[in-house]
């Protein structure tokens, strides 16, 4: 006969093995979900565009963000982190990213939204590189599952340009 300790160890090992197997299947099942998020971002107004006293350019924008991220949610999704970034190139850096807005979306019911806001975070370039600059607005998202690996993706919207003169 085996002692109580041996039996408890066998039962615990079996339970952990089954739990690991269920987690692996849950993570694997996310690969079969049909994800087709959509988004549109409009710049409604440039509130101000100025040069700060220490020489950096700063922009304040009013954005209209429309997104449908409901297809990112499966039974294994805990939450989705979404953010909008302005992306542009300068002579010193091939890619500059400035986060303008972000949100944590906890449920599928909140994943379809329309908001009109001024940028939540300051759009500042370290230098004076923003006058007349073309830039993209990109909606990034990170899907955080209950079990398994996180994944991220984005939608890039191009064709935006800042004015040539400060306002």
From Swiss-Prot:
One of its GO terms (cellular component) is signal peptidase complex. It comes from Arabidopsis thaliana. The keyword Transport does not apply. This is Signal peptidase complex subunit 3B. Essential component of the signal peptidase complex (SPC) which catalyzes the cleavage of N-terminal signal sequences from nascent proteins as they are translocated into the lumen of the endoplasmic reticulum. Essential for the SPC catalytic activity, possibly by stabilizing and positioning the active center of the complex close to the lumenal surface. Glycans are attached at residues 64, 136. Component of the signal peptidase complex (SPC) composed of a catalytic subunit SEC11 and three accessory subunits SPCS1, SPCS2 and SPCS3. The complex induces a local thinning of the ER membrane which is used to measure the length of the signal peptide (SP) h-region of protein substrates. This ensures the selectivity of the complex towards h-regions shorter than 18-20 amino acids. Residues 1-11 are cytoplasmic.
């Amino acid at each position: 006969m085996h002692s109580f300790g041996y039996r408890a160890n066998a039962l615990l090992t079996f339970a952990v093995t089954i739990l690991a197997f269920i987690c692996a299947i849950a993570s694997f099942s996310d690969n079969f979900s049909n994800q087709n998020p959509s988004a549109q971002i409009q710049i409604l107004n440039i509130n101000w565009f100025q040069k700060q006293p220490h020489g950096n350019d700063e922009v304040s924008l009013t954005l209209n963000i429309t997104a449908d991220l409901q297809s990112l949610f499966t039974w294994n999704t805990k939450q989705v982190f979404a953010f909008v970034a302005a992306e542009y190139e300068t002579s010193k850096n091939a890619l500059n990213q400035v986060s303008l807005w972000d949100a944590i979306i906890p449920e599928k019911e909140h994943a379809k939204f329309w908001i009109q806001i001024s940028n939540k975070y300051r759009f500042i370039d370290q230098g004076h590189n923003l006058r007349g600059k073309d830039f993209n607005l990109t909606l990034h998202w990170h899907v955080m599952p209950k079990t398994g690996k996180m994944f991220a993706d984005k939608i890039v919207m191009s064709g935006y340009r800042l004015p040539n003169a400060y306002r």
